[in-house]
Design a protein with these regions (language model features):
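Beta-strand-rich interaction surfaces with strong enrichment in secreted/lumenal proteins
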Residues: 14, 57-58, 108-110
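Flexible, low-complexity linker/boundary loops enriched in proline and small hydrophobic residues
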Residues: 2-30
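Active-site- and interface-proximal helix/loop "cap" or "latch" segments in soluble metabolic
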Residues: 61-83
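RNA-interacting cores
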Residues: 5-9, 39-42, 59, 159
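HotDog/MaoC-like acyl-thioester-processing domains
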Residues: 2-5, 18, 79, 111-116, ...
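Hydrophobic beta-strand-centered segment that forms part of the acyl-chain substrate-binding groove
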Residues: 3-7, 75-119, 145, 153
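Catalytic strand-loop segment that frames the active site of acyl-thioester-processing enzymes
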Residues: 19-61, 65-66
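Residues located in well-ordered beta-strands
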Residues: 25-28, 102, 107, 121-123, ...
Length: 160
């Protein structure tokens, strides 16, 4: 790994994302190269609360939650990259929140079920006027299960 590539454990992830159980959908960052890409993991367990109703007897992770997991990983990459771009320290703003603001070309290729390990791969396409665009892929056992282009933006002090 080069100096700008690092892994993050759950405690560091919590510093960058406001999400908490049951909506924190990233368990580990295996690689982040600021300004380029991020790789993350979500361990999908039978204990996830959304499996209680989706579907009884045939548990399937909701596709929108796979998208949300990708957006959370993109949020971390965007915050880290944006701060570096501005010459700021690599620390999240205490009251800054990164918002998921758009999605294009979303495709769901296969279901995600308990026991799967979701591998997320997010790459920056561009940033313009505070809006970041990313390509996002989710894989299970090397098989593509979801892909999309997502957009995020940050809200600093005061939530704007």
């Amino acid at each position: 790994m080069n100096p700008s590539t690092t892994a993050m454990d759950i405690e560091e992830i919590r510093r960058y994302l406001p999400h908490r159980y049951p909506f924190l959908l990233i368990d580990r960052i295996t690689e982040v190269e600021i300004g380029s890409h991020i790789k993350a993991i979500k361990n999908v367990t039978a204990n996830e609360p959304f499996f209680q109703g989706h579907f009884p007897g045939k548990a399937v992770m909701l596709g929108v939650l796979v998208i949300e997991a990708m957006a959370q990983a993109a949020g971390i990459l965007g915050v880290k990259s944006g701060r570096r771009e501005l010459g700021l320290p690599d620390e999240p703003e205490e009251d800054g929140i990164y918002f998921f603001v758009g999605i294009d070309k979303a495709r769901f290729r296969r279901t995600v079920v308990p026991g799967d390990q979701l591998h997320l791969d997010i790459k920056i396409i561009r940033s313009r006027r505070g809006i970041w665009s990313f390509t996002a892929e989710a894989r299970v056992d090397g098989t593509l299960v979801c892909e999309a282009e997502i957009m995020c933006t940050t809200a600093g002090r005061g939530g704007r």
